[in-house]
Amino acid sequence: MRNRRVARYSRRSFLAGTGAVAAGVSFGPKFTLAAEEAKLNFYNWDTYIGETTLDDFKDASGIDVTMDLFADNDELFAKLKEGNPGYDLIVPTNDFVERMIKAEMLVPLDHGKIPNFKKNVAKAFQDAEFDPGRKYSMPYMWGTQGIGYRKSRVDGVPDSWKWLLDSDKYAGRIALLAGSSAAIGMALKYLGHSYNSVDPKEIKQAEDLIIKQKPHIKVFAEDNGQDLLLSGEVDLTMEWNGDILQVMEEDDDLAYVVPKEGSIVWQDTLAIPTDAPHPDNAHKFINYILDAEAGAAIADFIQYATPNAAARALLPDDYSKNSAIFPTDETLSRCEPEVYKGEAAQRLRDEALTRILAA
């Protein structure tokens, strides 16, 4: 999820466009460091941050950010499950926030240290079923999952998961996401079930469908389906909307669609893991990200939907009114949020994916 390739604006050109440079407005206040050393260890999706955000934060605060990358939530969870190796801030998706709360892997946030949350974030994101009261997580970005495709190489718009999961028409030209939730969840949607089904029979149906389709699938991609699409290695890929939007900037033959059977709507968050060595610095960085100008620069660069209303207001219509970034109500009506289903249900999916990959 969330893999950035090319910039649209640098921080300076973005701020110049909004008049902020001329007005002498900075990205954030200079922070007074407390007892913590001026370091922050950030565990994030692949380059899922603004082009200059880390440097800008260092200029504003004196805090040096080191960023490590993970490919999916499973990797994030596994990395921290046996103990925090030293991270201060992580970016779990909504269902994994709930999972990590139950596993006591997150610490409560001090909202008093994050004033930009109430000031700038849209009211719809100021509470969450997966984290009531936003006790453990702050909203970062949100979006959908669907099909990225090369228009000149397919016959029409691939408006059904059938194109990827139940047809040999594009054999050898299809990529699926490798995560168990993504592949099995979309197979469940295609079969008319809930993405969040915990019924072993329904999960087995999804497994059987993908195994049957496997000879026609070129690759189960580790969050790089957009790169395979851009390079011409595949013509259809299961991917996150922002990843496809990024490569659409480089090639106007590429497009994105949410299939008619529906998909998921997800929300990525900012959270502090248990035993974080620099929790105060993590709070400062969260508040910085939720600043209007900083948040706008990040959203414009990575092309995902920001929950930061103040940031969205600063961005042009080709972002703020783009239905591939901010889906229509009709599209959202066909989507459902992924929820934490319990460890037993997660094992069912993980084991099903293991059998799929081994088939």
Each predicted region: which residue ranges?
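Extracytoplasmic ligand-binding site segments that recognize negatively charged/polar headgroups
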Residues: V91-H216, A221-L230
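Early extracytoplasmic/lumenal segment of secretory-pathway proteins
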Residues: A35-R99
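A bilobed periplasmic-binding-protein/Venus flytrap-type ligand-binding module shared by bacterial periplasmic
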Residues: G148-R153, K189-Y190, Q267-H278, I286, ...
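Conserved C-terminal helix/tail region of periplasmic/extracytoplasmic solute-binding proteins
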Residues: D329-A359
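Mature extracytoplasmic/periplasmic domains
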Residues: P273-R334
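N-terminal secretory signal peptides
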Residues: M1-Y9, A23
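Periplasmic-binding protein-like
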Residues: I203-K212, K218, E250-T274
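A ligand-binding cleft/hinge motif common to bilobed small-molecule-binding domains
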Residues: F96-I101, L230, L236-D253
